[in-house]
Amino acid sequence: IIYPGTLWCGHGNVSSSPDELGRFKHTDSCCRSHDMCPDVMSAGESKHGLTNTASHTRLSCDCDDKFYDCLKNSSDTISSYFVGEMYFNILDTKCYKLEHPVTGCGKRTEGRCLNYTVDKSKPKVYQWFDLRKY
């Protein structure tokens, strides 16, 4: 399913070339960049010492953070809002990054950790992290 007015926002894309964008160009550009993230983990794949047990692809936190910021700064406010809601709030996925071992959660809202506490005395390892709510 691709969000109406876009070619890149949804499962896969329906563009005829990497340069083609839909009617909502700003939103679609955010989705295209997100789709081209160089660090992804497909469903069932293991990488960086982690295994993606979700039924969908998960991305590095760097790519998801850039996607979030891109959508928030898009001039296509309505389409960006709906795409952000779907990805960050409804899909309720996680991202991964290299960070000192998590020891707890300093602040939690709606079942998601917003502020992790880490043990800086130990070396960084790849771990799963909750995404921000949109």
Swiss-Prot record:
Q: What is its EC number?
A: 3.1.1.4
Q: Which CDD domains match?
A: PLA2_bee_venom_like
- What is the predominant subcellular site recorded for this chain? secreted
Is the keyword Hydrolase assigned to this protein? yes
> Which tissues is this protein detected in according to the database?
Expressed by the venom gland.
Q: Which reaction does it catalyse?
A: a 1,2-diacyl-sn-glycero-3-phosphocholine + H2O = a 1-acyl-sn-glycero-3-phosphocholine + a fatty acid + H(+)
- Catalytic residues? 34, 64
Cofactor(s) named in the record: Ca(2+)
Presence of keyword Hydrolase: yes
Q: Where on this chain does Ca(2+) bind?
A: 8, 10, 12, 35
Q: Which family does it belong to?
A: Belongs to the phospholipase A2 family. Group III subfamily.
Name by which UniProt lists this protein: Phospholipase A2
The upper taxonomy is: Eukaryota, Metazoa, Ecdysozoa, Arthropoda, Hexapoda
